[in-house]
Amino acid sequence: MRRIGLSVAAALAVLVVLAGGVVWWSTAHETPLSRHLPAELKPRTFPTVSTAGLDPSRIRIIENLRREFDANRPGTYYSEGVEEPWCADFVSTVLRDSGLPLRNPNSGTWRIPGVYTLTEYFQKAGKLEPATPYRPQPGDVVLYAPEHPQLRQHTNIVVSVDGDTVTTVGGNQAGGISALTYRVADTFGIVGYGVPVR
């Protein structure tokens, strides 16, 4: 009788460990089933990125994006405690930490809290490329217009371009800091690309 109890307890322990492993694996890796989930339910995995041939400054941007993606901090970390939409704060922080600080054209500080002002910065600095015919590169900042059908006025950073597919990582997106993908041809609502590295 005692052996049966020990066997049952051992079997339950094995099942608990296996179930925990399955839960961990499914939250850390994309599976065929998780591809069809809404963004907020998908596993958080940083996109596959090749940095071969990239400028060292662009590599630093990608490395800092990966670090911030893994940390997944709240928006107030990037906005210096201010409760606000924080996508531009996130971009400002990543670029500053990559050795490419911005300069807010209104306040003179490194942090640019708004997409409109971020766009203005890139325009005045001569670093804004139109959505077409420019082909974005990893490290470029995507600037979305208020008319964009999904994101409205928003910004994030390109991490990879594969054929016609652009993958970005940004803050104040589904799940906090997340990756989004779009096609190069789908430029409606994209103002252009801020190019921090020439």
Predicted stretch roles:
Residues R2-W24, R35-P43, T48, R96-K124:
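Activation targets extended, charge/polar-rich intrinsically disordered C-terminal tails
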Residues V14-L15, R58-I59, R111, Y134, ...:
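Alpha-helical interaction segments
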Residues T51-D55, R103-A174:
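...with weaker cross-activation on analogous glycine-rich loops/strands in unrelated enzymes
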Residues P56-E63, P113-Y116, F188:
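Generic alpha-helical secondary structure signal
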Residues R2-V17, V23-H29, H148, R152-R198:
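Aromatic- and glycine-rich peptidoglycan recognition patches
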Residues E68, N72, A125-K127, I190-G192:
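Short, intrinsically disordered/low-complexity patches at protein termini
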